[in-house]
A protein has these predicted regions:
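Acidic catalytic cores of enzymes that act on phosphate-bearing nucleotides/polynucleotides
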Residues: 1-44
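Family-specific functional microsites
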Residues: 28-164
Length: 164
């Protein structure tokens, strides 16, 4: 435990996650409920189907949110706290957690009870699944457009090579 606390003091990445977990680290370790899932980890770490992260990796041209009209940067916190596309899912979450959806408050809720953990996990699963499906659809559409452009160029090139 002391080694973990020391490593967290000298962090190199994941600042927001560390700051959220550090105050409840002992409770996090001792809890008997909840398991981390892929999608829950995406929201806690900010590494997932978020415009900022995908843009940084070169998989999106901008970091803007594709799901709302605000033009805000798409981050885990934007998804958790603000994005209008997830209002219904957020309503279910707030009913259990209260209105403070800051990362430290969400982590405290998760550690505090299995009901809290399940509410946060359910939000993450539902929202991230929808975001992943939307990202795959954007990739398919982009790939289809790219193939159509290549095919048209090839046809023109083939036509130019035909004898008169």
């Amino acid at each position: 435990m002391v080694v973990w606390e020391e490593r967290l003091r000298h962090r190199s990445a994941g600042h927001a996650t560390i700051e959220a977990v550090r105050p409840v680290l002992l409770d996090w370790i001792k809890r008997r409920h909840g398991t981390l899932t892929f999608r829950l980890t995406q929201v806690l770490s900010g590494h997932g189907c978020f415009g900022r992260y995908l843009c940084r990796l070169g998989r999106e041209p901008t970091s803007g949110c594709h799901h709302c009209d605000t033009g805000d940067e798409d981050t885990a916190l934007h998804t958790l706290q603000e994005c209008s596309a997830w209002t219904e899912q957020r309503r279910d979450l707030v009913a259990v957690t209260g209105f403070d959806l800051s990362l430290p408050a969400v982590v405290r809720t998760m550690v505090g009870s299995s009901t809290g953990w399940d509410a946060v996990s359910s939000f993450c699963e539902r929202v991230m699944l929808a975001k992943e499906e939307a990202e795959r659809e954007r990739e398919r559409t982009s790939l289809l457009r790219s193939r159509q452009r290549r095919t048209r160029r090839r046809r023109r090139a083939d036509f130019d090579l035909r004898p008169p």
